[in-house]
Amino acid sequence: MSHQQPPSYATEPNTMFVQADPSNFRNIVQKLTGAPPDISSSSFSAVSAAHQKLPLTPKKPAFKLHERRQSSKKMELKVNNITNPNDAFSHFHRGFLVSPVSHLDPFWARVSPHSAREEHHAQPDKEEQKAIAEKGFYFLPSPRSGSEPAPELLPLFPLRSPNGTNHRIHEDNHRDS
């Protein structure tokens, strides 16, 4: 017969194993983590001494979602108003804010050469202004050259399959039956 020994655990000298039921677990933890108990004092005084050692700081209020929503309503956007219109780094042009790398930026306009296409769109002619006034919109010129044929538009609901007429013939056979 072999006698098995319980497994030995390496423990520190300050480690104490305690078995407690849930009803008095809190009291035992407070006793063990508080000041060393006096032999003459009762368990109630040890618990109250542990409570007295805790710092009396105000408890932080719990985070509430509705408070975050209310604080987001109070946010404000502050736009820098530049008073000098001749400022080369001003990002304001004709009363609206443009991108710092936009061709509408006055600084960018002096540094970057304009292409013919940009100049064409910058100043619409009288015909274009008339078309805009009549129709309410205008079309930009096509980037394609005029020598190329117009692209073929495909029907939205084709009656025949693009790979042949087999599909159409198959439908006709079903109608005859």
Swiss-Prot record:
The modification Phosphoserine is found at S43, S99, S115, S142, S145, S161. Residues 148-159 have a biased composition (Low complexity). It comes from the Eukaryota. The keyword Metal-binding does not apply. Residues 115-177 are annotated as: Disordered. Its main location: nucleus. Keywords: Nucleus, Phosphoprotein. Pfam families: VQ. Disulfide bonds: none annotated. Residues 115-133, 168-177 have a biased composition (Basic and acidic residues). GO terms for cellular component: nucleus. InterPro entries: VQ, VQ_4/11/13/19/31/33. A motif (VQ) lies at residues 25-34. Phosphorylated on serine residues by MPK6. Signal peptide: none annotated. It is found in: Nucleus. May modulate WRKY transcription factor activities. This is VQ motif-containing protein 11.
